[in-house]
């Protein structure tokens, strides 16, 4: 993932926003998504940010990116549904950041789990697990 030392000179970026956990293993799937985006779209800045329990926070990422020329940001909530964090906490944080960084466009996406493509993928994974031979 892009860090201040290795960040590409990109004007657009993606922040994968997740809840956070004290367990370092919990972060691995989300960080794998970020690495996949980096491989597929090397001209985009991409990183993960967390609500709590691990770093960096969304405000930390914006503080860094604001000094590195990233002015068009998509925040992608890595949640399966729109619970309280997606409905209340994240919009509140995002609105405060828009006020703090008026020159930066911050677009808050719907939670990833509410995308029909993700719903279909999860259904396919569940079905394939049921069709595997018993071991």
Model feature map: region roles:
Residues 1-135:
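Active-site-proximal alpha-helix that buttresses catalytic centers in soluble enzyme cores
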């Amino acid at each position: 993932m892009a860090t201040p030392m290795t960040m590409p000179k990109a004007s657009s970026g993606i922040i994968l926003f997740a809840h956070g956990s004290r367990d370092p293993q919990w972060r691995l799937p989300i960080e794998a998504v970020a690495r996949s985006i980096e491989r597929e779209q090397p001209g985009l800045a991409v990183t993960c940010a967390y609500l709590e329990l691990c770093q960096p926070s969304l405000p930390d990422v914006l503080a860094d990116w604001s000094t590195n020329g990233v002015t068009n940001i998509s925040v992608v909530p890595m949640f399966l549904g729109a619970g309280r964090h997606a409905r209340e906490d994240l919009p509140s944080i995002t609105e405060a950041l828009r006020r703090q960084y008026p020159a930066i466009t911050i677009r808050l996406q719907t939670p990833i789990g509410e995308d029909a493509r993700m719903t279909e993928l999860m259904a396919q994974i569940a079905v394939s697990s049921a069709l595997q031979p018993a071991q």
